[in-house]
């Protein structure tokens, strides 16, 4: 997992043969070394002398300068039939494009988000990095409860606060319909 943070995603992969993470922040590295010992953690991709079946990157790419160069480096570390799974926020998010919530815009376009991708821009940089057979799927990470938080409280965390009021089914239907807006 490239940009694995505290190792939460890797920690959930109980059936994996090996778990490897890349993370720059020392506090995260120390936490993983002390609390999540099954994860092999490194600070730099160059410190791995092996190839991987799968490389994941969740909400990391938008923080990186030189995205094509980094993607090329990741591609070199993939096995011949390896896959890379990338999750990024969409530049045309519902709360940006349809609702134009100023607070959400300020939250999303903070200084550490260097670029937000669209379908076209993500496919373009992946192609420039040498990836072929590119499949881009839309996924709505947060449901109605989270958006309700933005509409009412004008801040994140609605998925925590409103969780007890909004059923999983309503969240699922809402999220699926937002995905349809992008297709």
Please give the residue ranges for each predicted region.
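S-adenosyl-L-methionine-dependent methyltransferase catalytic module, highlighting the catalytic core
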Residues: 65-73, 83-183
């Amino acid at each position: 997992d490239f940009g694995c943070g505290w190792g939460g995603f890797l920690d959930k992969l109980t059936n994996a043969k090996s778990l490897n993470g890349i993370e720059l922040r020392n506090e995260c590295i120390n936490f993983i070394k002390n609390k999540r010992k099954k994860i092999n953690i490194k600070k730099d991709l160059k410190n791995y002398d092996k190839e991987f079946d799968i490389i994941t990157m969740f909400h990391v790419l938008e923080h990186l300068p030189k995205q094509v160069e980094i993607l090329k480096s990741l591609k070199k570390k993939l096995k011949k039939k390896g896959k890379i799974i990338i999750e990024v926020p969409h530049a045309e998010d519902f709360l940006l494009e349809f609702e134009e919530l100023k607070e959400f815009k300020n939250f999303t376009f903070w200084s550490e988000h260097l670029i937000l991708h669209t379908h076209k821009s993500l496919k373009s940089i992946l192609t420039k990095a040498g990836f072929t057979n590119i499949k881009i799927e839309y996924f709505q990470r947060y449901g109605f409860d989270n958006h309700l938080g933005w509409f009412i409280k004008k801040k994140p965390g609605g998925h925590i606060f409103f969780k007890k009021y909004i059923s999983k089914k309503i969240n699922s239907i809402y999220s699926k319909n937002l995905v349809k807006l992008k297709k």
